[in-house]
């Protein structure tokens, strides 16, 4: 890799690390190309990205970012998964690690907080931002629905009583 290409790679990685809220570091040694493609596509569907680069270049790119602490995890063949949603990258990485034993999660970072393997797994178990929004909307809509049911209930009960009385008169 030429010096200009290295500089461009470092700048690209640095921009990615500055804009990301969470990063997950894992070893990928022994994975096939098809498995790596599957990981990339799953990450892309979740709104996350996967980067494989030289560890030395990644460590340089980490300088001046919130996730600088993950530099100590960059040893051996590593992959870095990043996302703006704090749950997306960890969730996909943990699910992929369960299916592929050669994909080993080393740790990660959320903002300036360094996460060990258990921290990444705990983050992955949380609901995503979209799921939380859906639950919040459900909680906000539920009282309005109940109020609407309560206000229409007396009228419908009265209508049923009148209907029953009318059918009783017709039968007699």
UniProtKB/Swiss-Prot annotation:
<dbReference type="InterPro" id="IPR001790">
    <property type="entry name" value="Ribosomal_uL10"/>
</dbReference>
<keyword id="KW-0699">rRNA-binding</keyword>
<dbReference type="InterPro" id="IPR043141">
    <property type="entry name" value="Ribosomal_uL10-like_sf"/>
</dbReference>
<comment type="similarity">
    <text>Belongs to the universal ribosomal protein uL10 family.</text>
</comment>
<comment type="subunit">
    <text>Part of the ribosomal stalk of the 50S ribosomal subunit. The N-terminus interacts with L11 and the large rRNA to form the base of the stalk. The C-terminus forms an elongated spine to which L12 dimers bind in a sequential fashion forming a multimeric L10(L12)X complex.</text>
</comment>
<dbReference type="GO" id="GO:0006412">
    <property type="term" value="P:translation"/>
</dbReference>
<comment type="function">
    <text>Forms part of the ribosomal stalk, playing a central role in the interaction of the ribosome with GTP-bound translation factors.</text>
</comment>
<keyword id="KW-0689">Ribosomal protein</keyword>
<protein>
    <recommendedName>
        <fullName>Large ribosomal subunit protein uL10</fullName>
    </recommendedName>
</protein>
<dbReference type="GO" id="GO:0015934">
    <property type="term" value="C:large ribosomal subunit"/>
</dbReference>
<dbReference type="InterPro" id="IPR022973">
    <property type="entry name" value="Ribosomal_uL10_bac"/>
</dbReference>
<dbReference type="GO" id="GO:0003735">
    <property type="term" value="F:structural constituent of ribosome"/>
</dbReference>
<dbReference type="GO" id="GO:0070180">
    <property type="term" value="F:large ribosomal subunit rRNA binding"/>
</dbReference>
<dbReference type="InterPro" id="IPR002363">
    <property type="entry name" value="Ribosomal_uL10_CS_bac"/>
</dbReference>
<keyword id="KW-0687">Ribonucleoprotein</keyword>
<keyword id="KW-0694">RNA-binding</keyword>
<dbReference type="InterPro" id="IPR047865">
    <property type="entry name" value="Ribosomal_uL10_bac_type"/>
</dbReference>
<dbReference type="Pfam" id="PF00466">
    <property type="entry name" value="Ribosomal_L10"/>
</dbReference>
């Amino acid at each position: 890799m030429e010096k200009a290409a290295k500089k461009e790679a470092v700048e690209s990685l640095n921009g990615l690390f500055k804009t990301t809220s969470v990063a997950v570091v894992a070893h990928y040694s022994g994975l096939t190309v098809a498995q790596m493609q599957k990981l990339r596509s799953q990450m892309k569907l979740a709104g996350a990205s996967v980067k494989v680069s030289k560890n030395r270049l990644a460590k340089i790119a980490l300088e001046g970012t919130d996730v600088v602490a993950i530099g100590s995890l960059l040893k051996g063949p590593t992959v870095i998964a990043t996302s703006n949603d704090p749950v997306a990258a960890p969730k996909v990485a943990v699910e992929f690690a369960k299916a592929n034993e050669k994909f080993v999660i080393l740790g990660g970072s959320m903002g300036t907080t360094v996460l060990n393997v258990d921290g990444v797994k705990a983050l992955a178990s949380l609901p995503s931002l979209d799921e939380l929004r859906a639950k919040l909307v459900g909680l906000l809509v539920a009282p309005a629905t109940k109020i609407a049911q309560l206000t229409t209930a007396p009228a419908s009960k009265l209508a049923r009583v009148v209907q029953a009385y009318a059918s009783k008169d017709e039968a007699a």
